[in-house]
Amino acid sequence: SAAGDRKVLRKEWLQKKLAILCDRKGTVITKIYEVLSMEVKKIDDTQITNAIDLIWQTFLQFEAPDYSEEGVKSFQDFIESKEIIKTLEFWGAYDEEELKGVIATNENRKHICCFFVKAQYQRQGIGRKLWDFLRENSSSKTITVNSSPYAVPVYHKLGFIDTDTEQLSDGIRYIPMKFEK
């Protein structure tokens, strides 16, 4: 609904961060938990550059090694296209003011276009929180993604299934997938 689109969508959660102190022999002395306040919120025009930087740096680190030069260039052209970026909705996972992860969808939230978490924050539940937020705030019964080969296990863990075999378009390798609510 139009009214629903105007409201500010946010979701907060608490995440525990664990630090283990050990002596010189490796014996655990104590465990310290630090609770971090995390928030998912819409990324606006003033924050989009940070989101694109996070996407690009994470892509270069984890996905580009599996792509041809043409594929890397195609992805770069995609994320640098102001016309394309204007058609997408970007949501960020923030710890205070630090952007730790991004999920971007088409306007109707039926298709995931980008889904990245900074390397040092992966495997901490940030991607899951972004996904949960999208799933809860999409009116679509089916959400699709063209997953990179690197991210297939992540999407499977989130409940997506493959809808076809690996495809290649403009040097970009992907596996079409879908999630049914």
Predicted feature locations:
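Conserved active-site alpha-helix within GNAT-family acetyltransferase domains
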Residues: 149-173
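Conserved beta-hairpin
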Residues: 89-101
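Conserved GNAT-fold acetyl-CoA-binding loop/helix
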Residues: 52, 56-80
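Conserved GNAT acetyl-CoA-binding A-motif
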Residues: 137-150
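A short helix-loop-beta-strand connector motif used in the catalytic cores of GNAT acetyltransferases and
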Residues: 79-92, 111
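Conserved acetyl-CoA-binding loop-helix of GNAT-fold acetyltransferases
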Residues: 123-136
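A short beta-loop-alpha structural element at the N-terminal edge
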Residues: 38-53
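A short, internal acetyl-CoA/4′-phosphopantetheine-binding micro-motif in the GNAT/acyltransferase core
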Residues: 115-122
